[in-house]
Amino acid sequence: MQVKANDTTTARGREAEDRAARHLERGGLRVVERNFRIRGGEIDLICRDGKGLVFVEVRQRSRSDFGGAGASITAGKRRRIVLAAQHYLLGKPDCDCRFDCVLIDGEQLEWIKHAFSADD
């Protein structure tokens, strides 16, 4: 059986999200949803931090030829994450939230709290 490149990419992404989720849970967050999708946007992990929500983008790069994992989070990507978060928050008035990123470059993992805001 031949493995398609897309299947491999999906598996790597899932592994990165699993690794990020474990790290976030060790840091005190509780993962409440994974891969929340709407038309035009997606959030990798949605976590609970006390009474607030944390929307987490997970980016992985095995090589830095085109910049590290953080370089791949463009303004357009941030807008799509914010759009998905706004949709998720419908019906949840007065819910505090923030946007974090987990960057995985090779074996190194970095958790950036408050990585961007809805106004960026």
Swiss-Prot record:
**Membership in a protein family:** Belongs to the UPF0102 family.
The segment annotated Disordered runs over: 1-20
> Which top-level group of life is the source organism from?
Bacteria
Q: Which organism is it from?
A: Dechloromonas aromatica (strain RCB)
Annotated membrane-spanning segments are none
**A GO MF label:** nucleic acid binding
Please state what the protein is called.
Answer: UPF0102 protein Daro_0503
- Please give the InterPro entries that the UniProt record associates with this protein: Restrct_endonuc-II-like, tRNA_endonuc-like_dom_sf, UPF0102_YraN-like
